[in-house]
């Protein structure tokens, strides 16, 4: 597995550049800072990998100000996170879907890699997953996707979708949808969908 080969670093989760990963996390954190309720908030990190987002949260928030639950379908990273990062207020689970409702449901890179699947099936999976997660969201659902005018899955199994496809789906089915873009991540957009 990639985790066994590379250990707890971005390479093991297909994010080859730590700087780019931090940029992704910082978009999410900036949005949470602007919109977080007074008092403690709860975050579900779906597709948490080796726990990088939790570390970034702890760099930006007092650990008493939030509770964190990380979810992943890969056993090795979850075992690693449970050994190294689990504490009161930060738990990790071998599961693809959160166990309870959270203020923020975060998916950083969760939907970008899809081996052995056609685009139409992946898109159906993406939208079905967003529906499920929206029902477990109190304030906002935040996720990033690879964007292109040509919707496709590459030979490296990376999924690209049109920005308008995502925005239209989210506005029609969920709520106000904000987009965050950086020239340093030219093919990605972070979407923040808010409950009113």
Where are these regions (language model features)?
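Class I SAM-dependent methyltransferase SAM/SAH-binding core
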Residues: 44, 52-92
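Conserved class I S-adenosyl-L-methionine
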Residues: 39-49
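Conserved alpha-helix/loop element of class I SAM-dependent methyltransferases that forms part
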Residues: 20-38
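Short alpha-helix
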Residues: 158-174
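A short SAM/SAH-binding and catalytic strip from SAM-dependent methyltransferases
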Residues: 104-123
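Core SAM-dependent methyltransferase catalytic element
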Residues: 180-196
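N-terminal, positively charged/glycine-rich alpha-helical extensions of SAM-dependent methyltransferases
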Residues: 1-10
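Conserved beta-strand signature within the Rossmann-like core of class I S-adenosyl-L-methionine
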Residues: 137-145
């Amino acid at each position: 597995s990639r985790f066994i080969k590379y250990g707890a670093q971005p390479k093991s989760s297909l994010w080859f550049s730590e700087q780019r990963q931090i940029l992704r996390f910082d978009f999410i954190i900036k949005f949470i800072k602007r919109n977080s309720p007074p008092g403690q908030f709860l975050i579900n990190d779906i597709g948490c990998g080796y726990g990088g987002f939790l570390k970034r949260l702890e760099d930006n928030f007092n650990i008493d100000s939030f509770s964190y639950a990380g979810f992943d379908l890969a056993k090795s990273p979850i075992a690693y996170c449970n050994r190294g990062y689990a504490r009161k207020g930060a738990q990790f689970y071998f599961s693809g879907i959160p166990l309870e409702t959270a203020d923020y449901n975060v998916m950083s890179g969760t939907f970008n890699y899809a081996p052995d699947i056609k685009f139409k099936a992946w898109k159906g999976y993406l939208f079905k997953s967003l529906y499920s997660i929206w029902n477990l969201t109190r304030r906002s659902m935040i996720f990033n996707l690879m964007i292109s005018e040509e919707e496709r899955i590459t030979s490296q199994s990376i999924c690209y979708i049109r920005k308008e496809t995502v925005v239209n789906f989210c506005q029609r089915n969920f709520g106000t949808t904000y987009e965050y873009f950086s020239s340093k991540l030219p093919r990605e957009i972070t979407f923040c969908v808010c409950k009113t």
